[in-house]
Amino acid sequence: MSAPAPVPDVDGVLARASFADDGLLPAVIQQHDTREVLMLGYMDREALRRTLTTGRVTFWSRSRREYWRKGDTSGHGQYVRDAALDCDGDTVLIQVDQVGVACHTGTRTCFDADHLHPVTGARPAADEGPTP
């Protein structure tokens, strides 16, 4: 028999999280096994609390001004596998098991459609490090 999952210290996480002036925290959603970035959403304190305690990702919709869970209408759910605040506490990474597509356009990820073709840089060789 496996041990029950530990109960998260939600109050501690909420105290460490640094929400913006509008009360929101960017949430990067990533497929847990492939590390594919699926989408970016926003969470307020309650959405983050729900995400950490229910096993389903909950967002705050800035346009509709309401909570929503990916998959409640489409069936394309996001099931929490792990979560971490960044070093400043002002962004959260939620690793999920994505069922179906993540994007409302019907694509796997919200970042598939428009590649920007930036100028890319090359990492300097070991002997070409910064000049002292």
From Swiss-Prot:
Its cofactor is Mg(2+); Zn(2+). The keyword Hydrolase applies. It comes from Clavibacter michiganensis subsp. michiganensis (strain NCPPB 382). HAMAP family: HisI. One of its GO terms (cellular component) is cytoplasm. Pfam families: PRA-CH. Catalyzes the hydrolysis of the adenine ring of phosphoribosyl-AMP. Zn(2+) binds at C87, C103, C110. This is Phosphoribosyl-AMP cyclohydrolase. Homodimer. It is an enzyme of class 3 (hydrolase). It catalyses: 1-(5-phospho-beta-D-ribosyl)-5'-AMP + H2O = 1-(5-phospho-beta-D-ribosyl)-5-[(5-phospho-beta-D-ribosylamino)methylideneamino]imidazole-4-carboxamide. Pathway: Amino-acid biosynthesis; L-histidine biosynthesis; L-histidine from 5-phospho-alpha-D-ribose 1-diphosphate: step 3/9. Mg(2+) binds at D86, D88, D90. Gene3D superfamilies: Phosphoribosyl-AMP cyclohydrolase. Belongs to the PRA-CH family. Binds 1 Mg(2+) ion per subunit. InterPro entries: PRA-CH (IPR026660), PRib_AMP_CycHydrolase_dom (IPR002496), PRib_AMP_CycHydrolase_sf (IPR038019). Its EC number is 3.5.4.19. It is found in: Cytoplasm. Keywords: Amino-acid biosynthesis, Cytoplasm, Histidine biosynthesis, Hydrolase, Magnesium, Metal-binding, Zinc. GO terms for molecular function: magnesium ion binding; phosphoribosyl-AMP cyclohydrolase activity; zinc ion binding. PANTHER family: HISTIDINE BIOSYNTHESIS BIFUNCTIONAL PROTEIN (PTHR42945), PHOSPHORIBOSYL-AMP CYCLOHYDROLASE (PTHR42945:SF11).
